[in-house]
Every structure is written in C-alpha cells, then in structure tokens.
C-alpha cells in the first residue's frame, strides 16, 4: 500500500508530483519574463517535449508520476474546494468588490478543466468576455493580466515539500509565486489521494501573512535518519527555517535541522542548485559557492513544544557526517575547468534527482559533470534540457517527491 512519506533524498523514489509546462509559458514574453522570475522566454512545444521525456524516464524507473494540472482539475470537482480557491484568489481586496463578484461568477461557470488551465496559465483582459461596471477593468490595457500566469509552477519542488511523515506548504518569497501555494493547499485538503489520509501539515496551511518567514522546497533536503538540511538562500529565511524546524520538532518528525547560510544571488537561488544528495554517503557540490566555511547552525529540539537549541557548526560537511553517522562524505564537484564548471552549474549540473541510491536524472547537456558522476560510480539517466534549463531549474527543481523510502 502506498503512503505519504518521504524518508530521505536517496531512497527508492516511488511517487512524485510534476507540472508539464503549457499555457503559462505562452504568456511569458521578453517584457514580462523577469517579473515572472525567468531569464528568457522558452520554446513552449520543445519544453513540453523535454518534460515528457523527463516524466517517461521516471516511469521507466517504476516511479508513479502525478501531474499538477490533473490533480487540480480533480480537486475543482469538489464544490467546496472550487469555492475556497476562487474566494482565496479572487478577493474583494485584490479586485474590488464589484469586479471580484463578476469575475468569480464567470470562473464558477467554467468547466473544471478550463478553470484549472486559467488558474495555472493566466488570463489577459483581452481574453475576458464579461463586462463589469467596476473601474479596474476599464483602467487596464488589453494585455494586462486579470489572473497572472504561474510559469514557475513548473518547479513543483518549491511550493510544498514532504519531510518524513508530513508536508510543508511553503510561504513563497516572491509575489510571482505566492498563489502557487493555494493550489497545493486545496489539493492536499480535498483531492481523493490526500483527503482523509494520515499525514501532518507542518507549516503554511492557514490564511496568515507570514511576513519574513519564507521557505522554499529547493532549499530543503531530507537527508535521512531524522535529519533535515536547509539552505538559507535568497528565497528561504532564518525565520522560515526556525518556524519549520519548530513544527518538525513538535510533531516528533525530525531530530535535527542543519541550516547553511548561502550567498544571496541568483546562481544559487536554492540549496539544490549547488548541492544535492546522490547516494547514502555521496553529495554533488559546486565548490565555488559551497565552501566548507559557510556559516552553519545545528538546531535540535528542546522539550516537546517546538522550542529548540541553536548552536554554531563550523563545517557543514562535518555536521552532515555526524547526522548520518558517517566517517566521511564522498563529494563530487562540478565537472570541467573553472569556465566549464560555472557554465554547467548555471545549467543545473548539480540539480539532479536521485531515483534510488546511486542513480540520478540530469540534463544531458552537462557532459563534463555527468562524466565525473559516472567515474565516481553514479549512474546518470540523461534527459534533454536545452529549453527547460533556461528556466533555471533541473530535475530536482521540477519534481516534488510524495513517497520515498528511508535509507
């Protein structure tokens, strides 16, 4: 019987959530891509074909693939879920009471398939057939968005992350991604796969304003044996780490959290862009950023109510070794000379998805790093990524494990 549990980064991967890039990418243009957190526009059809190859590779490894669009359609079939999502996303404060009422009614009358496509892919004023007496639509240009597209939903890793016996519904840092979390909140509450199941919601499943307590799943590595490794990047804050750690400790789901202070720039927007877990004792690391002297803290529970001890750790590798009971980690650095390594890290060479110990999925374009992995005994299942890689995310970024074995 399948279960909702992720016990490691490297145990057998059994079930995963992906999101095929479609309508949202068609709304991505040179003039809006930076606001939507992309560096460039992607060839939509080619990106979809590359994503299909990624999903196919997972299925060939006996991994069950769930697709976000399908789950959202099936969730919207629950009337309470549909009403909640529209009330949450089409609020009076966001649109004004008159236009919000008119827009909600228009969306309520859509079939579930069409509504899911709009919620994920966006809607421009030029595509809106209804008239409203509100001022707001009269003041907008035709190509302005009524509902902003969510192209970053491609990166299902970030919006929610499963940690041992529960899930964190992450308060996202960037406004362009904050609506994503509500889709996962609805799915985990009402979709038949999750409704009534026994799992913990650690953090983020309420209607609070989280201020500076941001967490994104690309910074969260479930390294196993009760330990969690979290990067404090440009997207995850110390406040977010401590809130998540407190919830994990209170639930009895983690024995320690190792927090690493990362440089705050785009090339390492998340920990998993510079470091991933490939085998029980093996990590991929981009050494230009992941220096041994990065400020690191070890958080452990103090009592049973979520309080914690916080102590400095002077070497994150030693902290990981201690947590996993290993004498020494095996570190594989990004391949090629300094120029090639920088290029390949930028193209997600370190952002691989482990499907079982010593077997990972990564982009075929990163030839120097893939060769280095192979020589170190790591099998790389390569997938095309010339278009997907331009979104600044690799196989780990594009996947949210929902079921994975312990180590």
UniProtKB/Swiss-Prot annotation:
Top-rank taxon: Bacteria
Keywords: Arginine metabolism, Cytoplasm, Hydrolase
Annotated GO MF terms: arginine deiminase activity
Name recorded for this polypeptide: Arginine deiminase
Pathway(s) the chain acts in: Amino-acid degradation; L-arginine degradation via ADI pathway; carbamoyl phosphate from L-arginine: step 1/2
PANTHER family xrefs: ARGININE DEIMINASE
Family: Belongs to the arginine deiminase family.
GO biological process: arginine catabolic process to ornithine; arginine deiminase pathway
């Amino acid at each position: 019987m399948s279960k909702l549990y992720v016990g490691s980064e490297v145990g057998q991967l059994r079930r995963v959530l992906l999101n095929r890039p479609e309508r949202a990418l068609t709304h991505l243009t040179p003039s809006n891509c930076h606001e939507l957190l992309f560096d460039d526009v992607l060839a939509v059809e080619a990106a979809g074909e590359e994503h299909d190859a990624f999903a196919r590779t997972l299925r060939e490894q006996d991994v069950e693939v769930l697709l976000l669009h399908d789950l959202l359609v099936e969730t919207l079939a629950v009337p309470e879920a549909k009403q909640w999502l529209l009330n949450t996303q089409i609020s009076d404060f966001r649109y004004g009471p008159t236009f919000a009422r008119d827009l909600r009614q228009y969306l309520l009358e859509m079939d579930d398939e069409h509504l899911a496509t709009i919620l994920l892919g966006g809607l421009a004023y030029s595509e809106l057939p209804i008239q409203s007496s509100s001022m707001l639509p009269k003041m907008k240009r035709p190509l302005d968005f009524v509902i902003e597209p969510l192209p970053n939903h491609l990166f299902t890793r970030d919006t929610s992350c499963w940690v041992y016996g529960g899930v964190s519904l992450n308060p996202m840092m960037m406004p362009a991604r904050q609506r994503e979390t509500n889709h996962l909140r609805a799915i985990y509450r009402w979709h038949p796969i999750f409704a009534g199941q026994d799992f913990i919601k650690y953090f983020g499943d309420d209607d609070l304003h989280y201020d500076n307590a941001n967490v994104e799943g690309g910074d969260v590595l479930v390294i196993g044996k009760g330990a969690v490794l979290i990067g404090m990047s440009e997207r995850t804050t110390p406040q977010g780490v401590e809130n998540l750690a407190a919830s994990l400790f209170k639930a009895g789901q983690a024995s320690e959290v190792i927090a690493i202070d990362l440089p705050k720039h785009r090339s390492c927007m998340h920990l998993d862009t510079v470091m991933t877990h490939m085998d029980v004792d093996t990590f991929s690391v981009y050494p230009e950023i992941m220096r041994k002297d990065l400020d690191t803290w070890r958080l452990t529970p103090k009592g049973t109510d979520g309080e914690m001890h916080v102590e400095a750790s002077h070497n994150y590798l030693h902290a990981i070794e201690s947590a996993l009971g290993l004498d020494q980690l095996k570190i594989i650095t990004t391949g090629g000379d300094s120029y090639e390594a920088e290029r390949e890290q930028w193209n997600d060479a370190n952002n691989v998805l482990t499907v079982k110990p010593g077997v990972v999925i990564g982009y075929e374009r990163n030839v120097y790093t893939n060769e280095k992995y192979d020589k170190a005994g790591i099998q790389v299942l390569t997938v095309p990524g010339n278009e997907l890689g331009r979104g600044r995310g690799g196989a780990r970024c594009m996947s949210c494990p929902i079921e994975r074995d312990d180590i």
